[in-house]
């Protein structure tokens, strides 16, 4: 009997973001999957614990806590994880994406970026409308623009023999 994987709801289905930069955090259960989707905005995916996986066409990106994954606007992707993962997404309006990569990539997460993401995760609901919150999101975006790129971070394979080695 096949094991059913929990399908996670794609967080935003609206064609537009309510604000230019938006932060969202969640806990994804083991074997969770965000089905194939795309949005009009860019997305930076980060995992506080566990490893988030992002599949884009025939590329597979892994995001352990040292890395995040940048996804430019209008890119179809699937998000998944093998074990429970505490993760977040930074949604970036298309008007702010020009300084970020035009293709998906793994991004090195500096201690400052990690601290900003952790701070945002700890904020109570309703803080996202304040000028201070907006400035903090802009600083985070500025840091991501200059962060080193890391390709896909780790090699992966669907081959059963290679999969055990990798």
Predicted segment positions?
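Double-stranded beta-helix
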Residues: 95-119
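Ligand-binding loop in jelly-roll beta-barrel domains
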Residues: 74-104
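A short beta-strand-loop-beta hairpin characteristic of the jelly-roll/cupin
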Residues: 45-64
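Generic protein-terminus/edge-of-domain signal
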Residues: 1-51
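A generic beta-sheet turn/junction motif
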Residues: 40, 56-58, 83
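Short, Lys/Arg-enriched, Trp-marked, Pro/Gly-tolerant hinge/linker segments that flank
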Residues: 124-166
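Short acidic-glycine-tyrosine-enriched beta hairpin
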Residues: 28, 58-73
């Amino acid at each position: 009997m096949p094991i059913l994987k929990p399908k996670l709801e794609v967080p935003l289905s609206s064609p537009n973001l309510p604000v230019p930069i938006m932060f969202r955090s969640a806990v994804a259960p083991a074997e969770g999957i965000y089905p194939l989707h795309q949005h009009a905005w860019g997305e930076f995916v980060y995992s506080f614990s566990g490893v988030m996986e992002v599949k884009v066409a025939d590329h597979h990106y892994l995001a352990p806590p040292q890395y995040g994954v940048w996804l430019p606007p209008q890119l179809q992707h699937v998000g998944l994880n093998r074990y429970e993962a505490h993760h977040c997404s930074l949604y970036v309006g298309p008007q702010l994406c020009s300084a970020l990569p035009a293709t998906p990539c793994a991004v090195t997460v500096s201690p400052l970026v990690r601290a900003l993401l952790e701070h945002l995760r700890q904020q109570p609901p309703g803080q996202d409308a304040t000028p201070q919150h907006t400035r903090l999101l802009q600083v985070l975006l500025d840091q991501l623009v200059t962060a080193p790129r890391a390709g896909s971070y780790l090699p992966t394979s669907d081959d059963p023999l290679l999969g055990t080695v990798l």
